[in-house]
Every structure is written in C-alpha cells, then in structure tokens.
Amino acid sequence: MANNNSGNSNNLLVPGAAQAIDQMKLEIASEFGVNLGADTTSRANGSVGGEITKRLVSFAQQNMGGGQF
C-alpha cells in the first residue's frame, strides 16, 4: 500500500473530489443538525460519515446500472 508523509494512503483519483466530499459533509451535517468538530460526540460525527458512504454507494450503483456486486 502506498504511504505518504501525511499518513493517509487514500490517493484521490479525481481532481476536486476532496472539495466535493467536504461540501457533501457540510450539507449532510446541516440536514442532520450536527455541528461537526471535536466537541461533538463520535456518534453524531459518525452519523455524517455513514450517510456520506450510503449516498456514495447509492450514486455508484445508479451510475453502474444498479447491479449488485
């Protein structure tokens, strides 16, 4: 697995993806009434991450013909 100085091995393949994910994170947090940050519970912050994953999987399924993998 590739490793870089930041300790994060997730390499973005699409320019601008990080900004799009950050925007999605802020929109979902707003929908859920969650103020993201260190003072928020792990459960609340995690609910936002879980919803991001759910929406990204749904988006991928729709764009791949809706097939099960």
Curated annotation (Swiss-Prot):
A Pfam family that the UniProt record links to this protein: SASP
Positions marked as site (Cleavage): E27, I28
Keywords per UniProt: DNA-binding, Sporulation
GO molecular function: double-stranded DNA binding
Gene3D superfamilies: Small, acid-soluble spore protein, alpha/beta type-like
DNA-binding among keywords: yes
GO biological process annotation, one example: DNA topological change
Miscellaneous comment as given in the Swiss-Prot or TrEMBL entry: SASP are degraded in the first minutes of spore germination and provide amino acids for both new protein synthesis and metabolism.
UniProt function note: SASP are bound to spore DNA. They are double-stranded DNA-binding proteins that cause DNA to change to an a-like conformation. They protect the DNA backbone from chemical and enzymatic cleavage and are thus involved in dormant spore's high resistance to UV light.
Family: Belongs to the alpha/beta-type SASP family.
The protein, known as: Small, acid-soluble spore protein A
